[in-house]
Each structure stands twice: as structure tokens, then as C-alpha cells.
């Protein structure tokens, strides 16, 4: 299903097996999303919000993970508030995906009028100075759209990704990501291809919030709890001679607009130790996500790795027991 260019770049390829009847359901889903993407957002967003909330009630394991994460990160919020955040998260997810599909099908000129950049001058200055850049991007639902927009404007982009479980969805999703150019690097291939791309002038896209286990990670504060955070961005900025720029997209289903927030480069990381780097990474996530928690992918096992002697929260039977 895939080929490699220069032993580093992942290029999705159509496989003849995708025509098999076992994948027809997946193709129907792809066709449905394409049709929805061509529908004006003022009509599709309310429908997608209702469908998303409904799916969020059915997906009990995903909902449980999200509620556990929120209970540890925001213990000061009431149960009703956390439930509302999860509902809005599930509403936001299909809305953001539909905008991504619309961008791929109709092109950037159709969605640019609904995109607001905050801090665009930071990006423009680095482009003028021909600087190497790695964007630090918390895992939000609209995470791919800013990279696609920058690629559509001629900026070479490179990102790492995990394969989807369904090969048809994996093929379509990554084809959409590469719609306007750029490079994709499979995480299974390691970090070196990504480093090579950034050194060659591609702007990197790095998601800082996944749990990579205890090895090489630092236990640092994350909202009201703590998280095993890999301080790799500090090494990457040195090896690539790149500046690290925090970025976060926010999709508003009521206004049908995407706001892309860009914060000043994290130049303070150059001389920082691993613990400080890890904490600064989490601080940027908190700054972006705190005001708009529904934008974040709380369904991930963000807090899987715990300190010795502490039970993984998702295995605790006292936290949101399944019925």
C-alpha cells in the first residue's frame, strides 16, 4: 500500500485490495464525508455537531478516557462541566474533519475567507529570513489544516504520523494530507527522516502531547496533574538548527471559522535542561487548550505512564466504571 522515496518519505498508494467488498463500507464513509464537505458549513455544522454528540455517547471507551483525562486535569470543574466539554469535543471533531475535506476538494481559496491567523507576522518574518522552523502543535481536531494551508502557499512542510487502523481510511487520510505537497514520515521509520527534511528546508510539524512511555520522558506538571513528556523538541531544535514555534487551530462550529493561533518562538529552550523543556512544552499546551478544551483530543491515553507504584488511570475501576 505504500512506497518510500529516498528511503524516508511515506507516499500513500492505492492497493487493488481496496476494491474488495470488505472495504465498501469504508468507501461509503469516504463518499459521505466528501458529500458533506461540499455542503455549506452553515448547514452541515449543526448536523455534524448532533451526529458527533450522538457518536460520543455510543463510544463508551473513548468517552471514558476523555472523562478520566478531564477529571485529572480539571478537578475543579463540576461533573456536568466535564461532560459538556466532552460533548462539545465530539461535536467539534466531525466539523473540523469536514473543513479539512473541503480544503482538499475545493482548494484553499474557498476556505481562506473563513480562516483567521493570529500571529501570522511571526511566520512571515521567519519566511523572509529563510529560517528553519518546527511548529509545536497540540493534538487538536483541526491539527492538519494549518499545515495544508501553508503547503498550498508554497511552503514545504514535513510531519510525522501514525497509520490508521483501516487501510482505506489510512490511504485517503494521508492522500488528503499531501494534497498540496509536503512530506509525511511514518513514526515507525524513526525520527531521522523528519530531521533530514527540516535540515533540507521543510518546516516541521511536531505534536508534543503523546505518551511515549517512561524511557527518556520527564514527569512534569500538566494542568492539575502530571504527564510523562518527551523533551525531544529541545534536541530537535539544536540538531536541525530550527526555531520552535507553538501553533494551535481552533474550529468554531457556530461561526464556521477556523482561528490559527501562533505564539512567539520558544528560543528559551536552547540552554534549558530536559525537565525545563518538557514543562515548557506542556505550558504551551495549557495556554492553547485551557480556554478551549473542547478542541483537544482528550480521547487519547495522554496520562498512561505514571510514576512507580501508581496505577494507570485508564485501568482504575473506580474511575467512570463501564456499565
Locate each region found by the language model:
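Non-catalytic C-terminal accessory region of glycerolipid acyltransferases
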Residues: 2-19, 83-87, 124-128, 152, ...
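Membrane-anchoring hydrophobic helices of lipid-metabolizing enzymes
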Residues: 2-137, 170-172, 181, 323
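Short Gly/charged-rich anion-binding patches and loops
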Residues: 31, 65, 121, 145, ...
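General small-molecule cofactor/ligand-binding pocket signal
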Residues: 116, 185, 263
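Catalytic core of membrane glycerolipid acyltransferases/transacylases, capturing the structured
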Residues: 129-188, 214-221, 225, 255
